[in-house]
Amino acid sequence: MSLDIVILAAGQGTRMRSALPKVLHPVAGNSMLGHVIHSARQLQPQGIHVVIGHGAELVRERLAADDLNFVMQDKQLGTGHAVAQALPALTADTVLVLYGDVPLIEVETLQRLLAKANDQQLGLLTVTLDDPTGYGRIVRDEQGKVTAIVEHKDANDAQKAIKEGNTGILALPAARLADWMGRLSNNNAQGEYYLTDVIAMAVADGLVVATEQPHDAMEVQGANDRRQLSELERHYQLREGRRLMAQGVTLRDPARFDVRGEVSVGRDVLIDINVILEGKVVIEDDVQIGPNCVIKNTTLRKGAVVKANSHLEGAVMGEGSDAGPFARLRPGSVLDAKAHVGNFVELKNAHLGEGAKAGHLTYLGDAEIGARTNIGAGTITCNYDGANKFKTVMGEDVFIGSNNSLVAPVEIKAGATTAAGSTITQAVEAGDLAVARARQRNISGWKRPEKIKKS
């Protein structure tokens, strides 16, 4: 069975009170539409067709990709009208209709729905709610077969009492779709062309409407305002927390933990409160992450420890290495096994060899640091001349004294030592001691200046 997916993303979202198109509002660091597209791709369709309208150019700009076909809906005349705009591009056997503001839909739910769709049967995703206000109601006959969907504004009192609501997500036989679209009418309270009207048409044409439901009603929850958006965010985070805990992660408090990307984890991982994981994060076995950390596009090898209030981006921490508290590892930072980065240390494009240490109050940029080298407090690499970046290289077993300025390009070879307070501008040979500071001079009998008293 070949598959085309149509994603409806043309709505304005006036209740968001925003210049940003509704479908671009983020959930967990990705736009709502981005989440839907991600789920759609996992179904491996032959085409993904995104119907856009309000803010169309911005939506195209943010989400442009070779596998997406953007279809313009100039006037928002209803869901049926939106799907009709994509008709010329649909060539598969089955068409799945999704919504750009329903970001939590699970791929497994969609797979179950698609399994019920064929040339003689529609797949319709419904949801049973205690309060289905706003949802179209699923009307069934005495045998329990679906006969129609009635929109809330068009429903009578008996129909409004029905608890089963329409999610709008359905799988249709493509061969029938053009005929049904041509028969749609806007004779309703909204004056719109409802996609849901194809259900009654399908029944009249002798097709069966097979229903499926999500395991969790939040899967089909949309966001029309910022309160609903925040509810989606919190539900997504709790869902991700449950997923990670099932894989062997201890979360001190799943309600105070955020995932904003793709996270893979090992076993016996400990994550404290207020940790944010962004982008692609790999966490191996026995890793510990302290409170209030932000970790983005980073790999943490087995047994690595990230202490409180640290910020890591584009970094790799080797096995048994540690960073923090208050450490900042910027893109290109690599710590080999058992390397140590302490409090108020910043690394950028720096590689610390096995067992190397930078304990505190240090900036290391564009640096290659050998195994077991020790960097004294207050040391900085002077790597930028206002136009170009230069590299600092330190061999193995180097000892850098406190409060050093290492003016790149410069090399300090294996086993060398630099004295505290030095400004190193030239190469230091292996095993040498470099002293690059003014000699101390004491002035006897010196008196401090006195403040002039105001008259």
Swiss-Prot record:
It comes from Pseudomonas putida (strain ATCC 47054 / DSM 6125 / CFBP 8728 / NCIMB 11950 / KT2440). Binds 1 Mg(2+) ion per subunit. The keyword Acyltransferase applies. This is Bifunctional protein GlmU. Mg(2+) binds at residues 101, 224. Residues 1-226 are annotated as: Pyrophosphorylase. It is found in: Cytoplasm. One of its GO terms (cellular component) is membrane. It is an enzyme of class 2 (transferase). Homotrimer. Acetyl-CoA binds at residues 377, 383-384, 402, 420, 437. It comes from the Bacteria. GO terms for molecular function: glucosamine-1-phosphate N-acetyltransferase activity; magnesium ion binding; UDP-N-acetylglucosamine diphosphorylase activity. CDD domains: GT2_GlmU_N_bac, LbH_GlmU_C. SUPFAM superfamilies: Nucleotide-diphospho-sugar transferases, Trimeric LpxA-like enzymes. The active site is at residue 360. Its cofactor is Mg(2+). The keyword Cell wall biogenesis/degradation applies. Its main location: cytoplasm.
